[in-house]
């Protein structure tokens, strides 16, 4: 798929100009591919581990003979938790480094910032994070969960547990706001009261006002779409306010195994999380993935949904 898509869409004669302008070189024994993940900033806790999964997958693809006999050369960039930097790095990878495809992006804001780069150059982005839908592009492979695969099942579960009211909280960008719009529509159709809704800037560490409002609202549960380092601050304030999972559980959309390590497992006892993948998935393929990852990076390391999605995306290039 990578070598077939270098600069042109299969069967798309209208893309011939873009193909002629492409600087991707497939004449040698290697093909360059890129990775853009936040290795610094507030999202590094969630994104840096995704780079590890991508690196492992590239090594495995190369060990098995590469793509159409060509080894992959990985060029990595730091998105620094800023959408504008993601766009700048995407342009560098496509126009200067001449990569055949890019793996990366985390927030919907970073994906949307990069989208014009890939469409204008007719290049490929493999986006492995969950996303809100409402967008499609022939230049993006969306390999993460959509809302009907993550948000709706989590709401169904809360409803089954007798939840009659929710407080919505999220980081302030596209995915959390769109997710909560879906939550509100679901709530209206299912007789669930929305007690409140608040957003905080990416990277925010002050949740005192929001958590105080949550505590006062006394909802049955919290629907949480906060991401990155902000999760640590949110749960720290949640505990400081005397809230517990038994009193007001938190259903999180962006807390996976790596975030549990960062926040601390004792803080998250009996809390809820919704993902398409967990490290404990009992299949031969996952056991191999987890074993290979730990063999490379250490027995104490964990795998998560975004990591698995990125890892799988690289292997789809074979």
Regions found by a protein language model. Give the residues of each.
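Hydrophobic alpha-helical segments within soluble ligand-binding/sensing domains
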Residues: 86, 143-166, 177-178, 205-208, ...
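Extracytoplasmic "Venus flytrap"
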Residues: 19-27, 31-53, 77-84, 106, ...
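Beta-alpha junction/loop-to-helix N-cap segments that form part of ligand/metal-binding clefts
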Residues: 19-21, 45-52, 65-133, 201-204
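Periplasmic-binding protein-like
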Residues: 93-105, 126-128, 167-170, 218-228, ...
């Amino acid at each position: 798929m990578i070598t077939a898509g270098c600069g042109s869409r299969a069967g798309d004669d209208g893309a011939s100009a873009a193909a002629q302008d492409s600087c991707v070189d497939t004449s040698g024994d290697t093909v360059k591919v890129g990775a853009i993940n936040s290795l610094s900033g507030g999202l590094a806790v969630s994104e840096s581990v995704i780079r590890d999964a991508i690196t492992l997958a590239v090594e495995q693809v190369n060990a098995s003979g590469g793509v159409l006999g060509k080894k992959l050369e990985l060029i990595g960039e730091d998105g620094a938790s800023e959408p504008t930097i993601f766009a700048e790095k995407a342009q560098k990878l496509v126009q200067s480094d001449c990569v055949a495809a890019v793996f990366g992006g985390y927030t919907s804001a970073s994906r949307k910032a990069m989208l014009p780069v890939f469409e204008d150059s007719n290049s490929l982005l493999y986006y492995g994070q969950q996303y809100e839908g409402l967008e499609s592009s022939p230049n993006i492979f969306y390999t993460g969960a959509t809302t009907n695969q993550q948000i709706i099942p989590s709401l169904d579960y809360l409803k089954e547990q007798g939840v009659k009211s929710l407080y919505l909280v999220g980081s302030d960008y596209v995915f959390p706001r769109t997710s909560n719009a879906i939550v509100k529509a679901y709530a209206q159709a299912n007789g669930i009261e929305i007690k409140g809704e608040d957003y905080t800037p990416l990277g925010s560490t002050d949740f005192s006002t929001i958590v105080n409002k949550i505590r006062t609202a006394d909802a049955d549960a919290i629907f949480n779409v906060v991401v990155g380092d902000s999760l640590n601050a949110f749960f720290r304030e949640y505990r400081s306010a005397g809230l517990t999972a038994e009193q007001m559980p938190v259903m999180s959309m962006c807390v996976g195994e790596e975030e549990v390590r960062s926040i601390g497992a004792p803080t998250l006892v009996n809390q809820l999380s919704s993902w398409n993948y967990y490290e404990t998935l009992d299949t031969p393929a996952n056991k191999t993935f987890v074993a290979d990852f730990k063999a490379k990076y250490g027995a104490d390391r964990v795998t998560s949904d975004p990591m698995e999605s990125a890892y799988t995306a690289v292997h789809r290039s074979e």
